[in-house]
């Protein structure tokens, strides 16, 4: 029973408190509740090291997990206050970017909920990625000073400090902790490292800053612009600072728990989340040898402790750094890396598997694979592609290391918190058990034939659509029709995710309406995406979307039937509002390029129907829901891989033979678009599509248009559509991050649960 009361933390009547005072009181209450619950502990602990933890707002999530949300809500209501005011007041931590960061956040939630001793380990960025705005129909960036808005109060400064040597530069870290609440269980920690010397006043125009002053800039931004050498070096500094702190923390804690370091694998499991934390491997070797362990034994210890998760099929995202970078930043590690590479060369003659290639580049993924005991992909298709093509040479060496762990999401945030209306309906039908055992959602399958239940699902979706419509108008002034189909693509802007394909469909529909077509129901196309500041074509795609939206939304002949909305500064909080309101989930990456995706799972759980390629986790979604409850299109991954292998794809050939496609592409540089947008940027995008189209937008265009037409037609059968929604919700249980984490633990970490 909860004995903590909000009024005990204010010193005066709640009715007399400001929002800030109430927020700080709620924060203090949750921190005390966490301490009362206790923290998961045990002999062996997993350290989940990641450059990103996109945790989202914490207040409501923590109150729900601690079982006191309703109590606090009621106490506020008695004082004439609304808990939603506190939720809106809260500022979102800027500690991540896209799917990688959201996955990390879901995983630490599940680790805590399942009672597994675990810490997330990363960096305490001051300004995160950036805050996005739109001016002149272009993306503009500015610092996201999230730590100045009270959110830093969640982040408790500790008295732990570590020295990190980077060449002649000695850095002294400070560790911060954020409580990670488990749902009905004990808590965990997110450990974040920072430098006290970092100075936000170093930031000039936009997000520009002096990249050479490492002591002042190290943790200013996540993923600093690496289009020049200083930016690349800064990334190496960041990565080493993160893992050196992590390695020192891990060894200290394991010794405290009784390890003699020879038996480190009995006390620690390290999950390397993508290649950013890869330097933890040679850093651990260095620290172990400094403590008297022979280097050869240190290699084996580190291999037994470390496991690597690969998150990408894109070669560009598999980090490779020139050797001279390491000589500049971590000269003390370079001899270790060279000896590790010599050990690989002595064992395997194949030059393609060496850590240091013939050009002197250090391949981080290669180091991870050789010196980890487990290598996993994040969806079955992704893992198969790694084994069969992208990492086939490594798979032949270490078939026993490779395994699949299909990603998952935390249902606590992605339905219980963000969609209480649907949560209430599910619980009414099948009870509370699904909240901790998501497989129980399967019990909803019989209700897919129950018209009363289906009408309830439609009603709740309609409620969320109206709420989002009202919020959007208040937030950025866009008016949308809640009776329209909400067609949603919200994810990081990248050519392989193919926002440009969705844009071409919208242009095609616009041209069709201008020719006299009158759709039965309007469609609102939502985009939400940030483009990396140095990613020119991604920024051009955003510009084209904004220019086109200004045309279509202001055309009285078209806007009653089609609207295009580009959401400003898309983040977790916005996703929590839009995903429950969405009808169609756009998951249209080029087959073979998306490792998994997790947005697809969040949409599915909230009753949106997927329109997607057979890529990433879409393949597993399709198998679970059946072909009647998903809309798939496009080339297969095998066909795409074959095109790349043969280098036989020519964009212009597709453009010439498809008049509908050509008309949509040509519209990018039409008089209307050039008047609305920037000629240079639109021409760049046009030329890129016609001259290269590296992610094969054109071959999938016809199939995409036909399939979306099919989806929009199916939407008109409201009971038929509701059945698709019900099946998707019922089958979403497999994609719980609790299931994923259980698999990691059973197959890789072998921790004992503290529950």
Predicted regions and their residues:
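A conserved ligand/cofactor-binding region detector
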Residues: 1-755
């Amino acid at each position: 029973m909860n004995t903590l009361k909000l009024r005990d933390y204010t010193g005066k009547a709640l009715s007399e408190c400001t929002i800030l005072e109430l927020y700080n009181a709620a924060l203090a209450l949750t921190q005390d509740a966490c301490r009362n619950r206790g923290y998961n502990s045990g002999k062996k602990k997993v350290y989940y090291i990641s450059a990103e933890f996109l945790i989202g707002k914490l207040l409501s999530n923590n109150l729900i997990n601690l079982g006191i949300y309703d109590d606090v809500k009621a106490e506020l209501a008695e004082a004439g206050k609304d808990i939603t005011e506190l939720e809106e007041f809260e500022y979102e931590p800027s500690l991540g970017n896209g799917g990688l960061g959201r996955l990390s956040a879901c995983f630490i939630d599940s680790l805590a909920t399942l009672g597994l001793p675990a810490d997330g380990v990363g960096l305490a960025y001051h300004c995160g990625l950036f805050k996005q705005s739109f001016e002149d129909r272009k993306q503009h960036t500015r610092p996201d000073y999230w730590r100045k808005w009270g959110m830093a109060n969640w982040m408790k400064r500790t008295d732990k400090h570590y020295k990190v040597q980077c060449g002649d530069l000695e850095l002294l870290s400070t560790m911060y902790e954020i409580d990670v609440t488990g749902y009905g269980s004990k808590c965990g920690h997110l450990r974040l490292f920072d430098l006290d010397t970092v100075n936000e006043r170093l930031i000039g125009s936009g997000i520009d800053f002096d990249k050479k002053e490492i002591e002042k800039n190290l943790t200013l931004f996540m993923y600093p612009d690496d289009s020049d050498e200083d930016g690349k070096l800064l990334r190496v500094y960041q990565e080493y600072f993160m893992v050196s702190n992590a390695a020192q923390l891990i060894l200290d804690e394991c010794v405290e728990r009784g390890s003699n370091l020879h038996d480190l694998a009995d006390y620690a499991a390290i999950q390397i989340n993508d290649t950013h934390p890869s330097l933890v491997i040679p850093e651990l070797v260095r620290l172990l040898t400094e403590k008297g362990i022979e280097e050869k034994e240190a290699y084996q210890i580190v291999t037994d402790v470390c496991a690597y998760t690969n998150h990408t099929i894109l070669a560009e995202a598999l980090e490779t750094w020139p050797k001279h970078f390491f000589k500049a930043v971590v000269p003390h590690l370079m001899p270790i890396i060279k000896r590790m590479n010599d050990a690989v060369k002595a064992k395997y003659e194949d030059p393609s598997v060496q850590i240091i290639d013939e050009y002197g580049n250090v391949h981080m993924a290669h180091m991870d694979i050789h010196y980890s005991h487990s290598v996993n992909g994040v969806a079955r298709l992704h893992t198969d592609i790694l084994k069969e093509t992208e990492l086939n040479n490594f798979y032949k060496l270490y078939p026993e290391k490779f395994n699949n762990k299909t990603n998952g999401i935390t249902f606590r945030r992605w339905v219980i918190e963000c969609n209480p209306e649907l949560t209430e309906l599910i619980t009414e039908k099948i009870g509370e058990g699904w909240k901790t055992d998501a497989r129980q959602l399967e019990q909803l399958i019989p209700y897919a034939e129950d018209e009363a239940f289906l009408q309830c699902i439609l009603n709740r979706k309609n409620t969320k659509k109206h709420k989002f419509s009202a919020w959007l108008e208040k937030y950025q002034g866009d008016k949308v029709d809640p009776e329209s189909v909400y067609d949603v693509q919200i994810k990081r802007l990248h050519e392989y995710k193919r926002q440009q394909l969705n844009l071409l469909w919208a242009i095609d529909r616009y041209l069709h309406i201008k020719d006299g077509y009158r759709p039965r129901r309007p469609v609102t196309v939502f985009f939400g995406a940030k483009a990396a500041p140095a990613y020119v074509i991604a920024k051009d795609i955003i510009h084209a979307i904004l220019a086109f939206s200004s045309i279509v939304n202001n055309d009285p002949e078209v806007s009653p039937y089609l609207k295009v909305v580009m959401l400003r500064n898309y983040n977790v909080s916005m996703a929590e509002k839009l995903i429950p309101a969405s009808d169609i989930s756009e998951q249209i990456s080029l087959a073979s390029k998306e490792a998994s995706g997790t947005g697809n799972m969040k949409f599915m759980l909230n009753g949106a129907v997927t329109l997607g390629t057979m890529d990433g986790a879409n393949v597993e979604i399709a198998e679970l829901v059946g072909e009647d409850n998903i809309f798939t299109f496009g080339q297969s991954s095998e066909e795409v891989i074959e095109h790349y292998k043969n280098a036989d794809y020519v964009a212009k050939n597709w453009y010439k033979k498809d008049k509908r496609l050509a008309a949509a592409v040509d519209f990018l540089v039409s008089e209307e678009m050039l008047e609305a947008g920037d000629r240079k940027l639109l021409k760049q995008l046009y030329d890129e599509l016609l001259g290269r189209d590296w992610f094969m937008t054109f071959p999938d265009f016809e199939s995409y248009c036909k399939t979306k037409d099919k989806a929009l037609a199916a939407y008109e059968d409201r009971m038929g559509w509701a059945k698709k929604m019900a099946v998707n919700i019922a089958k979403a249980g497999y994609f719980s991050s609790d299931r994923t984490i259980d698999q990691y633990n059973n197959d890789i970490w072998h921790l004992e649960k503290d529950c």
